[in-house]
Amino acid sequence: MPPAEGGGMEIIMLDKVNKDISKQRKYMNWNNMLLHLEALYVLDNALTEPEDDDLRLIRKFETDNMIKYIVDNGAGDKLTVLFTETAVLIKGFAHENSLNQFAATEWNQGIIDMMYEGLDEKMKNLFTDDERQETTFFIWYDGEVHQNKIEGNDGGRWLLGYAFDTYERFEEFARDYYDMEFDNDLLRKLYTYSALSELELSKLIQGV
């Protein structure tokens, strides 16, 4: 018996959700960050024209054993979140923070090295030397949260807000950043599952 009209799209959507769930089970996660960053990536990717690639808010890189998201707000601040099977690595760079060595009177590599102290060398090497230099805070989660704060300075943890721990924060940001109103049900579905069918995504980015 052929599937009911629209059934094919539902099957594709279900398959996408199942694959995303499988990824979430494969990789270490913290506060559903993987789900929420993927939702932001899907939305930003759909709303960014190819010719405006340099204006993307978030980029995604994936290998067989790692998923990495880089959020760049265009104002000099970056949040990089890297998911592996055993840890979540979170690197923040808040350019106005006093721990920004590029703005320091004298470069102090020891400050940066201290942020990564205690992290397995293999994990540390997932970032290049240049990437590590662009750090004002570093957190890793392996079942427990680790952060080496420098003199009580959190290094700009406000950047973690881009992982949107509540739908309300995600919705407010999306509305303000993209300057448009979204269908609330579809946007909530995207936030909850990090996936929409092509038809749903097309409808979402048309706004209301």
Positions of PLM-derived features:
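Alpha-helical solenoid scaffolds in large eukaryotic transport, assembly, and signaling factors
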Residues: 88-89
